[in-house]
Each structure stands twice: as C-alpha cells, then as structure tokens.
C-alpha cells in the first residue's frame, strides 16, 4: 500500500515539473526571439551605415559591398535559422508559424518571378498584409526569408541581396506597427497610405547600399570630406535623378493592390491566425 501511495505521489508530481519547464520556456522564448530580431535589425542598419562612418576603409575595399556582402548574408542567415529553430523547438504554435512563413515566402517567390514593372513588384502586397495581420516580428522575418528565397530563384544573388532582405523586412515590420483596431475601411486606409510611403522609403534606403562608393566628385556623389548637410543634399539629388520615377511605380502599385485585394487577404490571414492560435508578435 505504501509503495502504491509513493508511486501515486510520484506520478502526480511529474506533470507539475513538466508544467514548470513549459512555463519557463514560455517566458524565455519570447525574450530570445526579440533579442534575435533586434540583432538582425542592428546588423542590417550597420551594413547600410558603416561606409559613412569609416570612409577610409570603404575606399580600400571592393566597391558596392562585394567584400562584406557575403558576410552580411551569412550573419543574417544564421540569425534567421536560429529564429526558425527556436520556433520549431517550441512545440504547439512554433511549427504552425514556420509553415505559414513558408507558404507566404513561396508566394513572394512566385510573385517576383515575372520580374519588376519599373520599380513595382506584387511581392510587396504579401509583406504588407502579412506584417499588418501577424505583427512586426513576423513581417520582418517574412521580408528577409522571402527576399532571400526569391533571390535564389530569380538569380538575384549579389552584394545587394542582404540589403534587399533587410529593407523588405523593415517594410513588413512597419506594416505590423500600424493600427489594427477600428473599421475595415480605416485599417485598409492605413495600410494603403503606408504602402504608398514605404514604396518611396524602400527605394530611398536601398540606394544607400551603393551610393557611398560613388566618389567621382560630382554634385550627386558621396563626399567623405564634406559635411553632413552637403551629403544629404547630394544624396537627395541623386535619388531624384536615379530612383524617384522608378519608386513611384512601386508606391502607386502598392496602393492599387492594397485597395483591390487587401481586405480579403487580411481577413484570410486573420482567420488563419485565430484558427492556428498564432500570437501577433
């Protein structure tokens, strides 16, 4: 009888220990995820900015990030893999999140295959609606993964790839920070407005990946010895000449797609998130 009681007590104690371990993982995993996402954003920001901070070093390396581009991709790839393994290791919600990420990433690849019409590509609608529905963390991760995968399929591998990954990831994160409450009309209006603005901001940021290496002394080039305000004027002039018209196609295209299919796609993602019990992060 004593043995049975002891066995019963041990059997009842086991679930308690398992529950405590599960609770510890529940507390730990979100913190690790946030730290990894923050690290990826910091790496992306430094990748864009370091030539401005260390112009003497930039002048001696291969132009247009041909020397450091692969290292940036490797660093971002390692962080993305860590995030995916973290989600898969959670159990329950994790694999569902990764599966949805894979489906939406494949959609981005399919929409990029036809190429760009001027600066517009329909892949941005996926990042915009997914980020808005599933949150800034998911939006950033999808932007990075989708651009990397699509770069492989369309032959877009080059020193520009890590900058595309980060820039599209920022578009998805920004969409996730928009208000989601209120009426559908307000939500779509916010998303359309952000799609328009992000169409220009994406191009404005992407031009920075190679502009610091244009040091030919022209009025549109980077001048390491010039002041900050002078270089801002140079860059804005360069952007107007090189990218403004191109990016207008993207901005207008984003608005058209959001207004045309934004609501049904958002509703489908919201419904999938509820059924799969995905948390907006």
Regions found by a protein language model. Name each.
Residues 81-91, 133-135, 174-182, 263-270:
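Structural signal for the C-terminal ends of transmembrane alpha-helices
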Residues 8-23, 28-129:
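Hydrophobic transmembrane alpha-helices
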Residues 74-83, 169-176, 251-264:
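Hydrophobic cores of alpha-helical transmembrane segments in multi-pass inner/ER membrane proteins
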Residues 109-124, 144-179, 189:
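Interfacial aromatic-anchored transmembrane helix boundaries in multi-pass membrane proteins
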Residues 104-110, 133, 173, 196-205:
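Small-residue-rich segments of transmembrane alpha-helices in multi-pass membrane proteins
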Residues 20-71, 157, 162, 180-281:
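Membrane-embedded alpha-helical hairpins and interfacial helices in multi-pass inner-membrane proteins
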